[in-house]
A protein has these predicted regions:
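Short, well-structured beta-strand-loop connectors
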Residues: 70, 167-176, 206-224
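Cationic-aromatic interfacial patches
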Residues: 20-91
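Bacterial N-terminal signal peptides that target proteins for export
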Residues: 2-9
Length: 261
């Protein structure tokens, strides 16, 4: 899939040092543009910059201080301190799970992972994202997490706090591929935007869409809630590119790409 640069007005793309075999650096959760060939069009999300074709490569959080290789390019992912988040959940059964709940979460993780592994080419993605909800950012991407002082997996999403019932919209056009009520995520939606770009929405109080439904940019898909394992009403928003969780905040920063060119 190829799209013009203008479709990426709000997406962070690192455009530095495209020389062959040069080592490049980026932060975890970012996207880097790598020179592409016509053979890459059906395999990657690509963008045309100054009449040259580039494929968009996500930088995994888990590979900090490591290098990945894309064709002839070496990309080293920086070590970055995103800070930490400590929360207390009064309901201990949501932290130290019973066997029944543990079995449930295991089954649910398989369902969710199957959806997130989806790769389709039905739609040309538009990375000119809009903010899915009006609220206050309560926890940013990359934070170390502690729940009741127990270390947990890092927070690779964006939490936006808002009043119960606040409208949530699709940040760009896509197809709903999963709707469900899950132990951790509560009422949950996954949207496929095409070519490995997916978004998910957790802890909703209401869901206004169905599986296989096409949603357009700005269309209402749900409402903020506190279902699942939470401490209060908020949207837990995750963005995936090629199965890598990238920083959602980069996609909604107005004029971010233009500032790099």
């Amino acid at each position: 899939m190829k799209t013009k640069l203008k479709n990426f007005g709000l997406c962070y793309i690192c455009l530095i040092s495209f020389s062959i075999n040069a080592e490049r650096f980026g932060d975890p959760g970012e996207i880097i543009a790598v020179k592409a060939s016509s053979d890459d069009i059906d395999k990657y999300l690509t963008v045309e910059i100054n009449e040259s074709l580039y494929k968009l490569i996500p930088l995994p959080f888990e590979k900090q201080n490591e290098s990945i290789y894309v064709d002839d390019e070496k990309i080293t992912i920086n070590q970055k301190d995103f800070g930490e988040s400590r929360i207390t959940i009064e309901n201990n059964s949501m932290v130290n799970l019973s066997k029944e709940d543990s079995d449930r979460t295991f089954k649910e993780s398989k369902i969710i992972q199957k959806a997130l592994n989806n790769y389709s080419k039905f739609l040309v993605p538009d990375l000119n994202f809009m903010n899915p909800v009006k609220g206050i950012i309560s926890s940013r991407y990359g934070k170390k997490r502690y729940i009741n002082n127990q270390p947990r997996s890092p927070h690779l999403s964006l939490d936006i706090a808002a009043a119960e019932g606040t409208k949530i919209v699709s940040p760009t056009t896509g197809r709903v591929i999963l709707v469900g009520d899950f132990f951790y995520a509560g009422n949950y939606i996954v949207i496929d935007h095409g070519y490995g770009l997916l978004t998910s929405y957790s802890h909703l109080s209401k869901v206004f869409v169905e599986e296989n439904q096409i949603v357009t940019k700005g269309e209402k898909i749900g409402a903020v809630g506190s279902t699942g394992r939470v401490t209060g009403p908020h949207l837990h928003w995750t963005v995936y590119l090629n199965k890598v969780r990238i920083n959602p905040e980069l996609l909604i920063q107005e004029g971010y790409l233009e500032s790099l060119l």
